[in-house]
Amino acid sequence: ADAPPAFGMCKACHSVEAGKNGVGPSLAGVYGRKAGTLAGFKFSDPHAKSGLTWDEPTLTKYLADPKGVIPGNKMVFAGLKNPADVAAVIAYLKSL
């Protein structure tokens, strides 16, 4: 699947190739994974201890308000304000 336009902000820091981390962790296979568990990437404590799983409800909230869902996380992204953009990014993440 092609990345939606809203994913442009994500790819500034995230790769979609397995094992290829950028400033942020690779998003390959992220859907369904427990937050903060990707091997080979140093997550912030708040992220690693969040206990979240990247499913549709969690991603919907997180992509709209990252700091509200995981206070103190290192991601310098304010969130997607358009629900259609959030849905498009989640659909893309499911395909990775």
From Swiss-Prot:
Cytochrome c2 is found mainly in purple, non-sulfur, photosynthetic bacteria where it functions as the electron donor to the oxidized bacteriochlorophyll in the photophosphorylation pathway. However, it may also have a role in the respiratory chain and is found in some non-photosynthetic bacteria. This is Cytochrome c2 iso-2. Transmembrane segments: none annotated. One of its GO terms (molecular function) is metal ion binding. Binds 1 heme c group covalently per subunit. InterPro entries: Cyt_c-like_dom, Cyt_c-like_dom_sf, Cyt_c_1A/1B. The keyword Isomerase does not apply. It holds the Pfam family Cytochrom_C. Heme c binds at C10, C13, H14, M75. PANTHER family: CYTOCHROME C (PTHR11961). GO terms for biological process: photosynthesis. Belongs to the cytochrome c family. The keyword Lyase does not apply. Signal peptide: none annotated. Keywords: Electron transport, Heme, Iron, Metal-binding, Photosynthesis, Transport. It comes from Magnetospirillum fulvum (Rhodospirillum fulvum). It comes from the Bacteria.
